[in-house]
Amino acid sequence: MSDILTEVRKTIEKDRQDIYGNPENSFNIIAQFWTTYLKSKYNIQIELNGRDIAIMMSLLKHARMVVQDNYRDNIIDAIGYLTILGERL
């Protein structure tokens, strides 16, 4: 079994970045879409940013861990989102 923190670092710096590009840009684009959706759907004034997205994506992974027995990948992803939050956003 590989070291989780090493796997997290590889995931956010290589694997996911190669697929999805720079997380700062990606999270800010997601924030724009989610902001538009929430404003339209619920008629609320809200402005999400990349930091909000990192937190909410981590919360999504935590929710999955509650209902799934095999959750190593969710742990890696949750730590990855929080690492991006702490280091890049």
Residue spans for each PLM region:
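Intrinsically disordered, low-complexity regulatory regions
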Residues: M1-L89
